[in-house]
Amino acid sequence: MLVTASGAPGTAALLHALRDNGEREVRLVGTDMSERSVGRHLCDAYHHVPAGSDPSFPDTMLEVATRESVDAILPQSSFDLEGLAGHVDRFPMPVLVSPVDAIQRSNDKALTYELMHRLGVPAPAFFRVDGAAGVERAAHELGYPDRPVCFKPVFSSGSRGFRILDPTVDRAHQLLYERPGAVAMRLEEALELLPEGGVDLLVMELATGGERTIDGIANGGEIVLGHPKTREAMRAGLAMYFVTLDDPELMRLASLIVGELGIEHFFNIQLVGDYVIEINPRISTVVYQEDLNLPYLGVKRALGEISDDELRALRPRVRPGRTALRYFDQLEFDA
């Protein structure tokens, strides 16, 4: 099995789950754009590949997958999805990606929010702009400085490029007591840094409240297996604590989104408070159970070894309250 972006934060847990599947031995092939990927050490074979946005990425992945005789390809990074999806019919093995249209509408946050509003799903008010002048106009339209707003690139992954515009931010406190990379700043500071033109930006109402996600496996029209979970204890842009939830309303909302977008294989839908803020048509952090191995089940489905009905029959195994605590680890080797 080939796992892309094998330097991603969840890689070690994912690889362990794929190996510890209780059915068979699995040979793992990792790829990453970084030479310092942990996949180099945790996989049975490793290949340094171009970035997912590089035009040569699909051909390189096809070459690696063919040379290694893998049975399936599991992408971890949002940046790998579209390049693979556009060439999926060239691969002799299953590639666990959604159709190109579903990926594009999910990764373009403006299109995502437009869809949410059309479906009646709560999502932030927003403006799609480019350049400092556009950000300034949109921020004031959304209520700045009376209330904080936020922005991020239309095309991004996770918290990359996300900033909160807050006129009350204590810059002295940030300077003296916070780690570098604080996400809050004043509008005028952002305007000094932003060029005119440049990438499209999404200026948004700031969603507040607890974070939750719905994760699972979809069949292009509905969720066949999945569950909601909390997303807590942020550190360096990553959540470090997750608790499985029993929330039928969140599952209903996720089913509506999955069906409208036509998502296939793995998905992750993220909420802050009541607002949907992100749709990721890929695998994300998993709360693992010894009797419910979502990544392995998703791969089995792609290989035709388990049916959607058989996956639906596993839904009662989801254990609300099951908790995952993420932590930092390290390994040593002689260079």
What are these model-derived regions, one by one?
Residues 1-31, 69-72, 76, 128, ...:
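Preference for protein termini
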Residues 1-99:
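ATP-binding N-terminal substructure of ATP-dependent carboxylate-amine bond-forming enzymes
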Residues 68, 233-237, 241-335:
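ATP-dependent carboxylate activation and anion-phosphoryl transfer catalytic cores
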Residues 175-259, 273-275:
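Phosphate-binding site of ATP-dependent enzymes
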Residues 103-201, 220:
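Active-site nucleotide/adenylate-binding loops and adjacent lid/helix of ATP-dependent enzymes
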Residues 40, 56-60, 104-111, 159, ...:
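Short, charged, surface-exposed secondary-structure boundary motifs
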